[in-house]
Every structure is written in structure tokens, then in C-alpha cells.
């Protein structure tokens, strides 16, 4: 009914489980170790109502600020009118998963650390240092290619000469 205003109202499609994904979740979701400062994504699991966050936080990414035996404290930014408010939620671990938002950053950080380690070794040997990647670049165009072979026939394309139709 459209006028009923319960806590989980209008979540029929939002909280639905994926195809062949019904029933209880794996134990690995509960046993995952979260530390303070980790980025997590809130994805509500409707098969477990305990510790289920409000529907407005479904799909949001936040940081862990508190770890309890049965719940994880997550800080999430929420837009309220014309400002952004930090909300602190306690969520059951079934409804959160590690976020991949820092994956690219951590990979680049590890790559830069490896280059710096190589540069220390090269400096001791007196060889030129490797350049550090300054910032991320968009995908570059493909390099030029040479076409080899005498059997390739080229045709010159030119516009037709204008002829008056009147």
C-alpha cells in the first residue's frame, strides 16, 4: 500500500537477492577482519534482518571507526538539504564488504615504492635513476605501425570535379 510508512518501505527491488543467491550468506562474510580506517561498502543482505542499516545507506562507501564483537561502526557521508553530514552507524558484518575504492591507489603506491627501492640501489652503483610516475595518465593512443610488403596496392582518393547541374 502506498500510504504505509514502515522502516523497510519501498525496498522490494532494492533489497532483493541476486539470481541463485538466496539463503544464508557464506561464513567468510562474517569472519572477515575489519580494522579501524578500512573502507567498506554497505550492501544490505535482506536474508538477515539483524543489524540491517536503513535503506538510504545501501550502496554507500564509508570508513570503519569502531569494531565491536557483533557490529562494525561505519562513518558515512549523507547529504541533508544543502550540506553533507557524517553519520555514524553500527552495522552487522553481513551487510558490509571491503571496498575496492583504494585498490588502484594502493597498487600505484606499491609500484612507486618499488621504483624508489631500485633507485637507492642504482644510486649506490652510480647508474642513472629511474623516473617516478608523477601522476595518473589517461589511456594513451596506440603507437605508430609500419606496413611492410610490396604487394599492397594504394589508391589515391580525391574529390570529384564540380560540375554545374543547371
UniProtKB/Swiss-Prot annotation:
Keywords attached to this entry: Cytoplasm, Endoplasmic reticulum, Ribonucleoprotein, Ribosomal protein
UniProt entry tagged with the keyword Ribosomal protein: yes
GO BP terms, alphabetized: translation
* Disulfide bridges in this chain: none
GO molecular function, a single term: structural constituent of ribosome
Gene Ontology annotations for the cellular component aspect, listed alphabetically:
cytosolic large ribosomal subunit; endoplasmic reticulum
> What InterPro entries does its record include?
Ribosomal_eL21, Ribosomal_eL21_CS, Ribosomal_eL21_sf, Translation_prot_SH3-like_sf
**Cellular compartment(s):** Cytoplasm, Cytosol; Cytoplasm; Endoplasmic reticulum
Instruction: Name the protein family.
Output: Belongs to the eukaryotic ribosomal protein eL21 family.
Subunit notes for this chain? Component of the large ribosomal subunit.
This chain's function reads: Component of the large ribosomal subunit. The ribosome is a large ribonucleoprotein complex responsible for the synthesis of proteins in the cell.
What protein name is recorded for this chain?
A: Large ribosomal subunit protein eL21
Q: Which organism is it from?
A: Entamoeba histolytica (strain ATCC 30459 / HM-1:IMSS / ABRM)
* Gene (name only): RPL21
Amino acid at each position: 500500500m502506498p500510504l504505509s510508512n514502515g522502516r523497510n518501505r519501498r525496498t522490494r527491488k532494492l533489497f532483493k537477492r541476486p539470481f541463485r543467491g538466496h539463503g544464508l550468506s557464506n561464513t567468510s562474510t562474517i569472519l572477515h577482519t575489519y580494522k579501524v580506517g578500512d573502507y567498506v561498502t554497505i550492501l544490505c543482505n535482506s536474508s538477515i534482518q539483524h543489524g540491517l542499516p536503513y535503506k538510504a545507506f545501501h550502496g554507500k562507501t564509508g570508513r570503519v571507526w569502531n569494531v565491536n564483537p557483533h557490529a562494525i561502526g561505519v562513518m558515512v557521508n549523507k547529504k541533508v538539504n544543502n550540506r553533507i553530514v557524517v553519520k555514524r552507524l553500527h552495522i552487522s558484518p553481513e551487510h558490509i564488504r571491503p571496498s575496492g575504492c583504494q585498490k588502484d591507489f594502493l597498487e600505484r603506491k606499491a609500484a612507486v615504492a618499488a621504483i624508489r627501492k631500485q633507485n637507492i640501489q642504482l644510486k649506490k652503483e652510480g647508474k642513472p635513476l629511474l623516473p617516478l610516475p608523477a601522476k595518473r595518465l589517461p589511456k594513451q593512443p596506440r603507437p605508430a605501425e609500419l606496413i611492410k610488403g610490396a604487394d599492397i596496392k594504394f589508391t589515391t582518393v580525391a574529390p570529384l570535379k564540380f560540375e554545374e547541374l543547371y
